[in-house]
Amino acid sequence: MSKSADKILHTAEKLFYENSFVGVGVDLIRDESGCSKTTMYTYFKNKNQLVKSVLEARDEKFRQRLLDYVAETTGREALNRLIDWHLLWFQEDNFKGCLFVRAVAESHLGDQDIISVSKEHKVWIRNLITEYLQSYSKTEMLVEVTYTLIEGLISRFLVEGYDANVAAEIKNSVNQMIDTLNPQSN
């Protein structure tokens, strides 16, 4: 991808995350990126394609950062690293929740590309949790509860602010649930 396209993507992602998809127009993205409207439309035929491309780029970065953080761990240790990574994200000064959820919330039912990219992102996270918990009994239940707790914390900490006590309780609860359902793992 060209430097101009990268600049447009980076600018659009920043503006969408800080504001909203609906509230940010292509004129603002053009002005902030320093690219012309013609250049924007050379790489992205419309705003929906730009949103989809932003989500795809964000998903790629998200996956790489998370996998780097969890690197060289497996099983429960990897799961705990995955949880820790999310807890660190929730504490960032500019934390605004999940861009994928926000994209779906602001999209129309016909925006299947945006919905599909967002769904793929969430399925990937759930599959990663499944990979880390596959050696435990009641895997499906452990995965669904863990995934739902993480997703719930995204909303909770966005609205209420980060709470270290709640974060620790959730992480401890996940580990206690694994131990309770898998006494041989203690």
Over which residues does each language-model region extend?
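Amphipathic alpha-helical packing segments from all-alpha helical-bundle domains
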Residues: L109-Q134, E144
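Amphipathic C-terminal alpha-helical segment
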Residues: Y147-V166, Q176-Q184
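Helix-turn-helix
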Residues: K7, T11-Q49, S53
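Alpha-helical DNA-contacting segments of helix-turn-helix folds
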Residues: V51-R58, R65
